[in-house]
A protein has these predicted regions:
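An alpha-helical, amphipathic repeat domain used for nucleic-acid recognition
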Residues: 1-160
């Protein structure tokens, strides 16, 4: 439903933003884009976003931390993919890098790579070639050093 510019008020924009945020966490950029697609004027959108930030309903750092925890711990993604996904969701590059670096200290990448391998290649797949494990980890966004350490460890453990 597109808003008519002559009918748009601070209240209507704020109500639309509340509806967006009620469904799930969003970055500032995502809320801006969704309100813009609904046809609200830029000035009203900016006023709304400022108000949401003042109220604490819109906080890119908090959202980035939450998303990063999910990506690294639950989805077993590497830092490269997590950082890329944060930026795609409207988190600024510097903030994305900072949040991912902090999360990495709590949850080392080698642990995430081990979990990813264990989840993808169970005991039934002992004959998985090393190249396949390497490619899988790289597709999950793990850096080269972690990929090769985890893949070598996986290879050693399946033989031994």
């Amino acid at each position: 439903m597109r808003a008519r510019p002559e009918e748009a008020t601070d209240k209507t924009v704020l109500a639309a933003a509340y509806a967006i945020l009620a469904r799930s966490s969003h970055s500032r950029a995502q809320v801006h884009d969704k309100l813009e697609r609904k046809g609200f004027p830029g000035e009203l959108i900016e006023n709304c976003l400022k108000r949401l930030e003042e109220l604490g309903y819109l906080d890119d750092e908090q959202v980035a931390r939450r998303w990063t925890q999910v990506m690294l711990r639950e989805r077993c993604w590497g830092i490269l993919k997590a950082e890329q996904k944060l930026q795609q969701r409207g988190i600024k590059r510097d903030l994305a890098r900072q949040v991912v670096d902090e999360a990495q200290r709590e949850f080392p990448q080698i642990d995430g790579a081990r979990q990813a391998l264990a989840g993808r290649f169970s005991d039934r797949t002992k004959d998985v070639p090393l190249a396949k494990t390497v490619n899988f980890l790289r597709s999950r966004g793990f850096c080269g050093e972690v990929v090769y350490a985890a893949a070598k460890e996986w290879e050693k453990n399946k033989i031994g």
